[in-house]
Amino acid sequence: MARIAGVNIPTGKRVPI
């Protein structure tokens, strides 16, 4: 499972870092 330069937040969305 690859993550795209971001962090998973409890809401199930990804925020760019």
Swiss-Prot record:
Keyword Nucleotide-binding attributed: no
Regions that span the bilayer: none
GO terms of molecular function: rRNA binding; tRNA binding
GO cellular component: a single term: ribonucleoprotein complex
The keyword tRNA-binding is assigned to this record: yes
Annotated keywords: Ribonucleoprotein, Ribosomal protein, RNA-binding, rRNA-binding, tRNA-binding
Subunit architecture: Part of the 30S ribosomal subunit. Forms a loose heterodimer with protein S19. Forms two bridges to the 50S subunit in the 70S ribosome.
Purpose of the protein: Located at the top of the head of the 30S subunit, it contacts several helices of the 16S rRNA. In the 70S ribosome it contacts the 23S rRNA (bridge B1a) and protein L5 of the 50S subunit (bridge B1b), connecting the 2 subunits; these bridges are implicated in subunit movement. Contacts the tRNAs in the A and P-sites.
Family the UniProt entry places it in: Belongs to the universal ribosomal protein uS13 family.
Name assigned to this protein: Small ribosomal subunit protein uS13
